[in-house]
Curated annotation (Swiss-Prot):
This is ATP synthase subunit a. The gene is atpB. F-type ATPases have 2 components, CF(1) - the catalytic core - and CF(0) - the membrane proton channel. CF(1) has five subunits: alpha(3), beta(3), gamma(1), delta(1), epsilon(1). CF(0) has four main subunits: a, b, b' and c. It is found in: Cellular thylakoid membrane. One of its GO terms (cellular component) is proton-transporting ATP synthase complex. The keyword Transport applies. It comes from Prochlorococcus marinus (strain MIT 9312).
Amino acid sequence: MLFNSLLTNFAALEVGQHLYWQIGNIRLHGQVFLTSWILLGALLVFISLGTKKMENDPKGLQNLLEFLWDYIRDLARTQIGEKVYRDWMPFIGTLFLFVFVSNWGGALIPWRLIKLPSGELGAPTADINTTIALALLVSLSYFYAGLSNKGWRYFEYYVHPTPIMLPFKILEDFTKPLSLSFRLFGNILADELVVGVLVFLVPLILPIPVMFLGLFTSAIQALIFATLAAYYIGEAVEEHH
C-alpha cells in the first residue's frame, strides 16, 4: 500500500498534467499564464520599490537594479558590438529578467504541490511551449537585426565562403532555436521535479541545499539564454557575417 501510494504521488509530478483554458477552438496552458502573471507582478513590485526614490548614491534595491542594468549593458555591448548594442538592450534585458524570474520561481516555489481542481502549476520556463516561443522570438530578432543592418546582403552569409555551406547554414537556423528551447526547458523542468519529489519525501531539511543548487543553475540558464540571444544578434550584424 505504501509503495502504491508513493507511486501515485510521484505520478502526480510527471509532465503533462496541464491546467487548460478553452477560448473558442483554442486550448491554452493556463498554468503558464497564471505563474507568469504572478512572477511578473512580483518583478514589477520589486522594480517599483527600487526606483521609488532614486538617489545619486544608490543603496539597497536601487543599487541592485543599477548593477543589473550595468550587467545587461556590458553583456549586450560585448556580444552585439558598440555600434548597435543600445538598440537591443531592452530586448536582451527583458529576456534575461523574464527567464531569470521564471527560473527562480520554479526553484523556490514547489508549484506542482499546489492543489488545483484540475491540472497543476509550474514555472513558465518548465513548459516547452514557453521556451520554444522565446527561442523563436530570438530567431526572429537576429533575422531582423541582420536584414535591418545589411538589407539583402545578409543572405550572402548562407553561401559564404562557398555555396556548399548553404544547406548546413539553413540547418543551423533550425538547430539554434531547438537547442535554446530544449536546454532551458530540460534544466528547469528537471530542477522543479527534483525539488517537488524531495519536498514530498523529506519536507523540512533535504530540499534546502537542492533549492540553493537550483537557484544557482537557474541563474546560469538565464545568463546562457540571454548571452546566446545577444551573440546570435551580434553575429547577424557583423560586417563579415
